[in-house]
Structure formats: structure tokens, C-alpha cells
């Protein structure tokens, strides 16, 4: 057996967080980004104009409508959608580069985007759906934010039912009763998924060397 064993590295993963508005996915996502240096937020491409202070390549990849359609035709997006008069999408290239480096990418997207990503990159995808403990609590949280009108809250509540119907399409479900416990649950999911053998690059050669080169 040689003194030097082959290096085992890890391929990164794509962590998708989805939930109805007010269930807590954004708060959980922010906590993950603050506490875990091995994961970063995905950067979307968009056709909308940059807002004051936004930096191209950091906040968004700003592209023309023509360029966006060209990228769609070339299948360069993991997922894409039209939102009102603008287009948004997740470029495949930058994400693949991050995954190869062993870092993870966090996505805050809805069930439709998750379906597209499952079709385009299932092996790298880990999806988590965050549920509220009750409909009453969901409405209380929405109203507690004090940033939406009664009409907007009603629309969000009406949309929540459809969004929650897609829970069986996700790998993991977290019922957000206690925020700290929910954050810990997602951290545990990440820890386990990172150790899956299919994400360990170089593992077969490593084990072969351990067994004496058989």
C-alpha cells in the first residue's frame, strides 16, 4: 500500500427552500447563510433594469431580453420564469462551477421552479418545503409583518393552499413551529446530504487503496 491515499473531495449540492409566504423559509435561509460558510445564495439572471445599488454578477446577472431568450434556447437555465413584464432564471454554468468546487448553492424558489430543477439536475438537488404549524398561525405571521394590506394578506392566504398542495414533490418537510429547531433541522439535512457516497468524489479509489489496491 502506498503512503499517500487518493484525495476524497465533495461535490456541492443545490438546496431548494420553498414555502407559502409567511411560513419562514426566508428567515431560515438567512440563518443558514450567516452560519454556514460552505453555502451561498444563487444569483439569478434577469431582464429587468438594475435598481440603485445593485451590482451585476452579485445581486443579479442583468441581461437583455434577446440574450435571455438565447440562453433559454441553448438550455442554459436550470429554471426560468416570467414574472409580470420581466424574465428571471438561474444560469446553469455558474452553479455547476460552484458545485464542482465543493460548495453548496441555496435557492429560494417556488414549486414550479423546483419542478424544473428536478428535471434538469435531479442528482444535485435537495429540496425542502417549509410548512406553518397551522393556517391561523400563517395568517398571524403575515399580519405581524405589518407590511401588507388586508387585500394582499388575503391573496397570499388564498395562494398558500395551492402552494402547500405540492409538498409531496419535496425530499424533506419541515413544520416551522419553533424557528431555532427548524433551522437546526435544515442544518441536519445538509449535514447528512453532504455525506452521501455519490457526492464523495474520489471515494472508490480511496477505498481501493485502503484495501491494498485490490
From Swiss-Prot:
ATP binds at residues 19-26. It holds the Pfam family Guanylate_kin. Its EC number is 2.7.4.8. Residues 12-191 form the Guanylate kinase-like domain. It catalyses: GMP + ATP = GDP + ADP. GO terms for molecular function: ATP binding; guanylate kinase activity. Essential for recycling GMP and indirectly, cGMP. This is Guanylate kinase. It comes from Paramagnetospirillum magneticum (strain ATCC 700264 / AMB-1) (Magnetospirillum magneticum). The gene is gmk.
Amino acid at each position: 500500500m502506498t503512503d499517500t491515499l487518493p484525495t476524497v473531495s465533495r461535490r456541492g449540492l443545490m438546496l431548494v427552500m420553498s414555502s407559502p409566504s409567511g411560513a419562514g423559509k426566508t428567515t431560515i435561509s438567512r440563518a443558514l447563510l450567516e452560519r454556514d460558510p460552505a453555502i451561498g445564495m444563487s444569483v439569478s439572471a434577469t431582464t429587468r433594469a438594475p435598481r440603485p445599488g445593485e451590482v451585476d454578477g452579485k445581486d443579479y446577472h442583468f441581461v437583455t431580453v434577446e440574450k435571455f431568450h438565447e440562453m433559454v434556447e441553448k438550455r442554459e437555465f436550470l429554471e426560468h420564469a416570467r414574472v409580470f413584464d420581466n424574465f428571471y432564471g438561474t444560469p446553469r454554468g455558474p452553479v455547476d462551477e460552484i458545485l464542482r468546487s465543493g460548495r453548496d448553492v441555496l435557492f429560494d424558489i417556488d414549486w414550479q421552479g423546483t419542478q424544473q430543477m428536478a428535471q434538469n439536475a435531479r442528482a444535485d438537488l435537495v429540496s425542502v418545503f417549509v410548512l406553518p404549524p397551522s393556517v391561523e398561525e400563517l395568517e398571524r405571521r403575515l399580519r405581524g409583518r405589518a407590511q401588507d394590506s388586508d387585500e394582499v394578506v388575503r391573496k397570499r392566504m388564498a395562494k398558500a393552499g395551492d402552494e402547500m398542495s405540492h409538498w409531496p414533490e419535496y425530499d424533506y418537510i419541515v413544520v416551522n413551529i419553533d424557528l431555532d429547531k427548524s433551522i437546526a433541522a435544515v442544518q441536519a439535512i445538509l449535514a447528512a446530504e453532504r455525506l452521501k457516497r455519490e457526492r464523495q468524489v474520489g471515494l472508490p479509489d480511496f477505498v481501493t487503496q485502503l484495501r491494498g489496491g485490490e
